[in-house]
């Protein structure tokens, strides 16, 4: 039986990053951008979010850590895609971020880079993170990305780190870790509505797609609010056509992205139709205990083919 997970949030939620680990061979150019850190917020039940990070030309980004356990997150812009990997050592509360602010997300942005310029490396600590964090930018050193099958290795050497705020030198350090990397795609929604609200006129104009080793998913965001999520495990080449029901707890409601509010739909279904890379997805009749009404969603949008191999479970 096809297994679909639908996640709805009717309140503002973090359109968080998701772990990905797939092989591709896209090469990225290197870019130099300096960033300053704005206000921060921290929600122990949801995600750590850095807000209002600005580059030298005033572009605003948000950085999101998915959870305290994943230690991997997504760094993105509402208007321009950014690829990021960051991993934290929660014992020491130190995180290292590497990203390419110019990489467009019109395809899977997993790439192999021989060397990146050092201004794409930012370091910050959890302790300062919780207190209107100071960010630390490296002004020397480099890092490399290497790929072996589905495993990516990131190595940073000779990194001299300075505070962005006052430019005082903090340390000379290295980064050496192996972890998953993100794979993200954004594409415009052709048409759509959620509970009768037009997705386009409401500013909900993005269909975002991610993958993990055993999962591919697509969801719609509204300026940072996650309003719909569909997922099936262990398949490639996109989301299969068909009807997905609430049987076997396959439709889930999560309010505010907090697992404490996770509820299963007692009825309802979603249908997926496909014409090439264009999908029409309708969700109807969702009855969820404690939630008034029956949420519905309809959209037509494009998704790329997931033409890479999945690892064995």
Annotated model-derived regions:
Residues 48, 88-90, 149, 158-160, ...:
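A mature extracytoplasmic/lumenal domain signature
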Residues 138, 147, 152-157, 301:
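Short beta-strand and beta-hairpin "edge-sheet" elements
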Residues 52-146, 191, 195-274:
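Surface-exposed helix/loop patches within compact recognition domains
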Residues 65-71, 156-159, 218-220, 282-288:
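Short beta-strand segments that buttress and anchor functional surface loops
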């Amino acid at each position: 039986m096809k297994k679909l997970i639908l996640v709805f949030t009717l309140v503002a939620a973090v359109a968080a990053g998701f772990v990905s680990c797939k092989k591709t061979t896209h090469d990225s150019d290197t870019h130099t951008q300096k960033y300053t850190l704005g206000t921060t917020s921290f929600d122990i039940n949801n995600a750590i979010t850095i807000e209002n990070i600005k580059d030298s030309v005033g572009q605003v980004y948000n950085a999101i850590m998915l959870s305290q356990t994943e230690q991997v997150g997504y760094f993105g812009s509402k208007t321009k895609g950014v690829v990021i990997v960051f991993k934290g050592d929660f014992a020491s509360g130190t995180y290292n971020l590497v990203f390419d602010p110019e990489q467009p997300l019109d395809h899977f942005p997993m790439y192999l880079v021989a060397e990146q310029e050092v201004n794409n490396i930012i370091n910050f600590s959890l302790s300062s993170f919780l207190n209107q964090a100071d960010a630390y930018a490296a002004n020397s050193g480099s890092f490399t990305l290497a790929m072996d099958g589905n495993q990516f290795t990131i190595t940073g050497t000779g990194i001299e780190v300075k505070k962005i705020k006052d430019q005082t030198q903090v340390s000379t350090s290295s980064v050496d870790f192996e972890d998953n990397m993100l794979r993200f795609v954004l594409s415009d929604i052709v048409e759509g509505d959620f509970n009768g609200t037009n997705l386009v006129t409401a500013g909900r104009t993005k269909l975002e797609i991610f993958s993990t080793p055993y999962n591919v998913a697509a969801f719609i965001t509204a300026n940072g609010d996650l309003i719909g999520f569909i997922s099936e495990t262990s398949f490639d080449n996109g989301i299969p056509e068909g009807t997905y029901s609430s049987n076997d707890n396959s439709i889930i409601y999560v309010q505010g992205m907090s697992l404490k509010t996770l509820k299963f739909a007692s009825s309802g279904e979603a249908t997926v139709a496909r014409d090439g890379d264009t999908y029409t997805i309708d969700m109807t009749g969702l009855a969820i205990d404690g939630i008034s009404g029956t949420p519905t969603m309809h959209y037509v949008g494009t998704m790329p083919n997931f033409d890479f191999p999945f690892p064995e479970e």
